[in-house]
């Protein structure tokens, strides 16, 4: 009787829109607020509201849109280069700018039908 070779799982199955593009970038820079003034104003005067919008856009719980984890999830989902350390520093130094950047990116990807 021969022993059966063990099955090794190389990639874990996931849930989501499929594989991320390999060479993607942010659609706008962190300080490009004038490219979408509505998002900028919402982020400045109603930061929690914008956080909830981002969380809802990504099918996550309310207010986690402002977190490092959400930025890292978004960045990895769309193949945007960077690291969790970069995400932490950006979110720590300018949470309003990073949240606005994610929302602008979501809006642009929606317009291109890639979100």
Swiss-Prot record:
Source organism superkingdom: Eukaryota
InterPro entries according to UniProt: PLAC_motif_containing
Any one GO molecular function term: chromatin binding
Coiled-coil residue spans: none
One BP term from GO: brown fat cell differentiation
UniProt family annotation: Belongs to the cornifelin family.
NCBIfam families documented for this protein: A_thal_Cys_rich
Protein name: Placenta-specific gene 8 protein
């Amino acid at each position: 009787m021969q022993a059966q070779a063990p099955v090794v799982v190389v990639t874990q199955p996931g849930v989501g829109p499929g594989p991320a593009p390999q060479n993607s970038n942010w659609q706008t820079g962190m300080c490009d607020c004038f490219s979408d003034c509505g998002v900028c104003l919402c982020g400045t005067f109603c930061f929690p509201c914008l956080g909830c919008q981002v969380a809802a856009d990504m099918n996550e719980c309310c207010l986690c849109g402002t977190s490092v984890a959400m930025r890292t999830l978004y960045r990895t989902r769309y193949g945007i280069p960077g690291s969790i350390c970069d995400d932490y520093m950006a979110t720590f130094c300018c949470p309003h700018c990073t949240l606005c950047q994610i929302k602008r990116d979501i809006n642009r990807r929606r317009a291109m039908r890639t979100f």
